[in-house]
Amino acid sequence: MASPALISETEAWKDLKAHLEGIKMIHLRELMGDTERCQSMMVEFDNIFLDYSRQQASPDTISKLYKLADAAHLKQKIDRMYNGDHINSTENRSVLHVALRAPRNSAICSDGKNVVPDVWNVLDKIKDFSDRVRNGSWIGATGKELKDVIAVGIGGSFLGPLFVHTALQTDPEASKNARGRELRFLANVDPIDVARNISGLNPETTLVVVVSKTFTTAETMLNARTLREWISSALGPSAVAKHMVAVSTNLPLVEKFGIDPNNAFAFWDWVGGRYSVCSAVGVLPLSLQYGFAVVEKFLQGAHSIDQHFSSAPFEKNIPVLLGLLSVWNVSFLGYPARAILPYSQALEKLAPHIQQVSMESNGKGVSIDGLPLPFESGEIDFGEPGTNGQHSFYQLIHQGRVIPCDFIGIVKSQQPVYLKGEVVNNHDELMSNFFAQPDALAYGKTPEQLKNENVSEHLIPHKTFTGNRPSISILLPTLDAYRIGQLLAIYEHRVAVQGFVWGINSFDQWGVELGKSLATQVRKQLHASRVKGEPVEGFNFSTKTLLTRYLEATSDVPADPSTLLPNI
């Protein structure tokens, strides 16, 4: 029986490899001089404008990328995802985060069952609960309104909701709805994170949302037990039922923990953690802070891109184009990283979230059939809002390693500022940099230009910019809840396109398991050493040395301590 073919074995891949050498000889200065080419590399959907003309690609490159998509059966794979097929083959699961934002009357099936009614049952439950908390009909154990929320989760249970929360904080409608309320996220098992989260909060007015599908995630459950103790020590054990709710499917463990199972909000195996922000994982805490109506607009924005992704032809399909260009940059041009550069402080948590979505999804070394990949896949994602990043790592991007960049601009600021007598307003100053940076990267500055400017000879090498550094520009009209949902879905589907073309499973994450299992061994050793005084055994010399040093330096830690909570 023949082995399954890798995408790199197809004629389309080989054709792009042959095409590569010619493209590498053409500088972006020359490519950008072709107006017809540039016009062909601009796409608009629902007033979202994508300009990918500053990619190291010709129209012929793009045509060949479409052929690569066909060779990878991209359209069929997208359809299979929407049809609920078990495309997460290693875990035998559907991948249906699109169902989380589907309209109530939609039909999206997993294993022959329409899951949309289940989704809306949970959404209706969230709306009812969040409305009651916000209007004061659900109160705490001492009769006070619950104005503060701590969401406890890690990974996808944290990064996505934090991104959306941060983006909504300065939106006029959302910020008005959030007045007098506080939403915090507790993720790290580091006790410092606990201290910072409870600092300044009153247990009487605090609601804790514990997010864990199985209710067994080690870090999350330790943090949840810590906050349970914080509440119980102040208000008594019975207060837990009024001050803690869960996002989980393990109702027996939820009840055992002390949370009423009626106050547990479900999500499903077909929702991956990093794709779960549109489930109760994100919708519950965000609705408590901003009201369900705002969050529903966010879901509608994501759904609009879901429809666009599934129906638009490749040449007009924003996630498909972005995904194919990433494959081109990574696997052919050899650029291992990508900078996500939103020119909006509201999007300061976009890059950390997409870092997880992308790197946990596509950080794989084998195909979906288990074959080692003979080409580079996956990207190292990082980023910072402009203009902060310009004063941080742009030096390397301009004159060091070539790193393709995503520039994201917003036409109308959430919070405009105008000062009389200034040459431009604050947002125009920001956007001046948004428009300038892609050209600086593409065109650079030659030694000849510097000579014409009478730059000293010895400084010319230091002031030369090679240019020819690719980027894309995305221009959004506003940054309200709807547009935030669209931006999220664009990046989610872009990641899926890359994985579909590379032929990998973008929806499992076995790479996180080994470290967790080794941590279990260390945890047992720490307990044995502290409680029984046992020496460190069963580890390599390096780990044994480090562990022994740590235990000796913390020998004053009691083996069976009394409860001690942060005091800050």
UniProtKB/Swiss-Prot annotation:
The active site is at 360 (proton donor), 391, 516. GO terms for molecular function: carbohydrate derivative binding; glucose-6-phosphate isomerase activity; monosaccharide binding. The keyword rRNA-binding does not apply. GO terms for biological process: gluconeogenesis; glucose 6-phosphate metabolic process; glycolytic process. Pathway: Carbohydrate degradation; glycolysis; D-glyceraldehyde 3-phosphate and glycerone phosphate from D-glucose: step 2/4. It holds the Pfam family PGI. Belongs to the GPI family. NCBIfam families: PRK00179.1. This is Glucose-6-phosphate isomerase, cytosolic 1.
